[in-house]
Curated annotation (Swiss-Prot):
Function per UniProt: IF-3 binds to the 30S ribosomal subunit and shifts the equilibrium between 70S ribosomes and their 50S and 30S subunits in favor of the free subunits, thus enhancing the availability of 30S subunits on which protein synthesis initiation begins.
Protein family membership: Belongs to the IF-3 family.
Name of the protein described by the UniProt record: Translation initiation factor IF-3
GO biological process: ribosome disassembly
Keyword Hydrolase among UniProt keywords: no
InterPro entries documented for this protein: T_IF-3_C_sf, T_IF-3_N_sf, Translation_initiation_fac3_CS, Translation_initiation_fac_3, Translation_initiation_fac_3_C, Translation_initiation_fac_3_N
Amino acid sequence: MSRNEVLLNGDINFKEVRCVGDNGEVYGIISSKEALKIAQNLGLDLVLISASAKPPVCKVMDYNKFRYQNEKKIKEAKKKQKQIEIKEIKLSTQIAQNDINYKVKHAREFIESNKHVKFKVVLKGRESQNSKAGLDVLFRVQTMMQDLANPEKEPKTEGRFVSWMFVPKAKEAPKNEKKTKENNPPFNRINLMKGENHAKNED
C-alpha cells in the first residue's frame, strides 16, 4: 500500500467522520479537523478507512508502521507460495520387482521432501492398445506408496504412456481419519479398470 492509494492527514476533508483508534479507541463522530488534531497530539496519522460509510470512517494510527507490517506480511506469504516440484519416474510393463523397489524408494524420498511424483509406464507395441499391463504396474506402485502419498485422481493414458501422479498425504487429526477413509476409498484393480473402460467409451 502506498500513500497514493489512501487519503491521510490533511488530505482528509469531511464535515464529519467516525473516528477510531488503532487499539480499539472510539473517538466518536467528529469533524475531520478534530480527528486530525487528535492524531497530531498523539504523534500519529489520520487515515481514511472507508469513504463510502456514512459518515466516512477514519483511524488514528502509525501509518508508516502499518505499511511496513503489511508489506512484510505480503513478502512472507510469497515465500510460502513455493512452486510445486514434480519428479517423474519411468517404468516399463516388464519391470522386475527389485527395480520397482529401487524406484519406489526414490519416490518415497521425493514425497518426504514434499515433492510430487509422477510415475509413467512406457507402453510398447500392442500394449498401447490396451493399457492394462501399465495399470497393473501402477497398482503395484500404489500399494507401496499408500502409507505416505495419495494418488491424484486416476491414472491417465497419454499416448505411449500411462501415468499416475502421487502427492504427499496431508497431516490430519486422528478424529478425521475415519471420515477421510469413508470419503476417499482406496483405489483397487476394479476401480482402475472401470476408469480405463470409461475413458475408452468417452473416446
